[in-house]
């Protein structure tokens, strides 16, 4: 004699959804013509989408920040490279 046992609970499949990463808040933080002080973040980015120009430093996570007080200027470096610079306040007043 054989006894057949059936499931008393229905098996439930798992879903492949239900995950989401935390926001990284990337992008331009100070626009063209904005006044910045030393150390202020201009752009948060992954990789060098925008390259540092005059008076702009680059952090280890490719964040661009001001090395001098001045006005932010976005421009092009060559045919297809974007660049951001900070024009010091003394030069901006004279120009």
Curated annotation (Swiss-Prot):
One of its GO terms (cellular component) is cytosolic large ribosomal subunit. One of its GO terms (molecular function) is structural constituent of ribosome. Residues 1-6 form a propeptide. PROSITE patterns: RIBOSOMAL_L27 (PS00831). It comes from the Bacteria. One of its GO terms (biological process) is translation. Keywords: Ribonucleoprotein, Ribosomal protein. The N-terminus is cleaved by ribosomal processing cysteine protease Prp. Belongs to the bacterial ribosomal protein bL27 family. This is Large ribosomal subunit protein bL27.
């Amino acid at each position: 004699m054989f006894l057949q046992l059936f499931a008393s609970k229905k098996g439930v499949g798992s879903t492949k959804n239900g995950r989401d990463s935390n926001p990284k808040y990337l992008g331009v933080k100070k626009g063209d013509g904005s006044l910045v002080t030393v150390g202020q973040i201009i752009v948060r980015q992954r990789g060098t989408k925008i390259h540092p120009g005059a008076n702009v430093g680059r952090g280890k996570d490719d964040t661009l920040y001001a090395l001098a007080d001045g006005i932010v200027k976005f421009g092009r470096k060559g045919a297809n490279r974007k660049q951001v610079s900070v024009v010091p306040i003394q030069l901006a007043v004279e120009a």
